[in-house]
């Protein structure tokens, strides 16, 4: 399990100094209906002939790489940094303490 704090003090390219950054997890946005690839695919699918492009079915990976989106508190400049693959990701969870009992 990976636990990342909600704020990180790191270098800002725009300010050119270390500043506090607000950390969020990157999420894929909704696909655009008018993008060139979508228009081409829709045009190809029209009419007779069934499915024209292969539908990908051989999934190999069980996890995705976590991408952190960091936004500078002062200038609102955003940067993204990838982490390693992990099954469980937590943003701003409780820190581990030595010698503490596990509570459920």
From Swiss-Prot:
Against InterPro entries, the record matches this protein to: Ribosomal_eL44, Ribosomal_LSU_eL42, Ribosomal_zn-bd
Q: Where is the composition biased (Basic residues)?
A: 23-43
Annotated Gene Ontology cellular components are: ribonucleoprotein complex; ribosome
Positions of the UniProt region annotated as Disordered: 23-60
Lineage here is: Eukaryota, Metazoa, Ecdysozoa, Arthropoda, Hexapoda
Instruction: For this entry, list what GO says about its biological process.
Output: translation
Q: What is the protein's given name?
A: Large ribosomal subunit protein eL42
Task: Please give the SUPFAM superfamilies that the UniProt record associates with this protein.
Answer: Zn-binding ribosomal proteins (SSF57829)
Give the UniProt family note.
Belongs to the eukaryotic ribosomal protein eL42 family.
| Short name of any one Pfam family annotated for the protein | Ribosomal_L44
A molecular function (GO) term = structural constituent of ribosome
GTP-binding: present as a keyword of the record? no
**Key words of the record:** Ribonucleoprotein, Ribosomal protein
According to its UniProt entry, this protein's organism is Ochlerotatus triseriatus
